[in-house]
Amino acid sequence: MNHLPEPAPCPATVTRSGPLTWVQQWHWFERTIPAPRRVNPTPLADHCHVPPPATVADIHAALASLTARHEALRTTVDPLRPIQHVHRADWAPLPVDHVDVPAVDAGTLEAATAELAARPIDPEREPPWRARVLIEAGKPRAVLVAAHHVVIDGWGLAVLINQLHDQLRGDNVPLISVHPLDTVAAQLPERARAAEREWLMRLASNPTGVLAPFGGTDGGGGRHRLQHRSADAYDDLDRVARRYRASPEAVVLAALAHDVATRTGEHRFLASVVVSNRARAALRNSIGVRALTVPVQIDLRPGAAFGEVAASVVTASAAAYRHGRWRPAELVAAQARMDRRRGVVTVPAIEYNCYSWPRDYLVPARNTPPDGSATWISSAPDEPCETLYVDFSRDAGFITLDVTVGDHLLDAEQALALPARLCGLLRELADGAECPVPARPLTPAASGWWRASQGWVSLTRVGDVLRSHPGVLDATVAPGVDTAGDGGEPHLVAHARVAPDVTPDDVHRHVLDQLGEVPGIMAPGRYVLSPAGLEPGRPPDRFRTATGGATTPRIPSRPPATDTERALAAAVAAVGPGGLPAGTFHSPDAVDMNRCLADHGVTLVAIPRLLALLHQSGFTGIASDELAGTASLGHLAAALEPLPTRAHHGGEASP
């Protein structure tokens, strides 16, 4: 069996159906990534206070009215195909419950919002949102709302809660709301391709691994999440923004860039900045998913005063905002191919998200400490994230900085110090300091790190990866220069003692397969192999990769050879462009196991079907984001495991 059953007929409650937008496709795929490997929160959650004299019945009526107005609140998605269905307003009961609490204070709100966000939402069968009313002394004091990212983004959630708050106050709210289905026809492929080209160019021309050598725990795993709230920094930020005639959001990004440059000595790096894509008036009341990232080029002059830094960030942001509409499925595949070709995973130094309006619907914070700031941090053994994520919001009387960072980039103490240091910089600037950009890092790079043209690389980790190949007996890695074809550009040279049958191609493929799994590595530019038992006088094998202009080696193709490889190859062929011809399930020889999934023209929108086909064949063990990365199919197939057998508990056996 090499194909899945066709989707079931739409239920009678469906009023219209259609494809997911390009942005939705990413979040639809993202929901299949195991939670410890995800960075974006799913579901999103926020709250608003209940203005008196609104009652619980008023809250239910307002939520029902919003459900009728916003089709996104009654949209479900197909589990295997990028399709969405809009249902009638009364298709399901309102997903609202009530909780009695002793007091609706900051601590209670924080815990209750986190608890609601932790409850999974099934966007395939249920409304993609839920609400909870907090009741204190018999009266509703706050409404919490959580929503699935596949139909609502952060800006959309703020629009929704703001309209809920306005309706509870008796204010009029806009009647027109654009659904993502209404924007599918307006997606322009040529504009998307231009944005994707810009992204790939920026990724390839900026260093990767900027933060890694200058902090974190050596070999650290897991990640830290923290939130810093400051009332003092609110006023300081206002003063700095007026001083430099820049938006508060741009000033915070400039401060973050200044901090990275001060810490690392890098003056040119990439920031991935989230934009709302809601410039048109018709979209400002839409709660649907539209936000995407743009590549903001950070280019700072050593010694430049902060005013010059802010101006350069404003200019770079304006240039980047043209590239806010692209196809995540196509860009992720193109980046996987590029990273595998270049031998290094390209990662922006910063991911920055901000809300451009104050959320004045929030419950007022009554527990702000006397010094005007408060911080909490939590650490988890999740998969480390490869960049520094900072979310900024500016609400009534305080700013909030949410930080997520891998322990190998910043340890817990360094993560806690980051937002406090940013607020300290704002205070200095507000007091009139110039705060020039240092020419050199505050501390040198950690031992074992080398700055290649592509970015920072850990020589120790590259050596460990080489030695993890079963045919490599020993290996050393060091920078070297070969003037034969690369203009004298330094690159990594690997010297390895290997088993007699191991070739440079074998070792190179092994390194490429580890790019997405081991942070801080890149493929050597040259391999010098000495087979064990080499006869005296015989030269070692040499091999060059594409570094500094040399010709990219042609990795030989390889058909599937094991049961797991054949199962994966059959699934790839079935979901690939054109599909698999009938009757060829047992002959997927055209699939090259030495290439990654993107090399076969398969993008992330096909991965849910691919995983379902593997499950149908009796295999599991590969995460969806691993399939979308740089690893070869042969490497992925080695991780497949048989599905666990289910114990029979009586009754008829399942077919």
Give the ranges of each region predicted by the language model.
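His-Asp-centered acyl/peptidyl-transfer active-site segments
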Residues: 14-16, 33-43, 60, 71-72, ...
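Short amphipathic alpha-helices and their capping loops
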Residues: 1-35, 60-104, 127, 177-223, ...
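Flexible, Gly/Pro-enriched loop and linker segments at secondary-structure and domain junctions
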Residues: 26, 37-47, 73-78, 119-133, ...
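Active-site-proximal acidic secondary-structure segment that organizes catalysis
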Residues: 18, 130-180, 415-428
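A short, small/polar-residue-rich loop/turn motif at beta-strand boundaries
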Residues: 2-15, 51-68, 83-125, 307-317, ...
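A short N-terminal helical cap/helix-turn-helix that marks the beginning
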Residues: 76-77, 164, 168-178, 202-211, ...
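Phosphopantetheine-dependent thiolation modules in NRPS/PKS and related acyl-activating systems
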Residues: 1-6, 501, 522-525, 530-655
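Extended, hydrophobic beta-loop-alpha segments that form or line the acyl/peptidyl-thioester binding
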Residues: 70, 74, 267-274, 380-442, ...
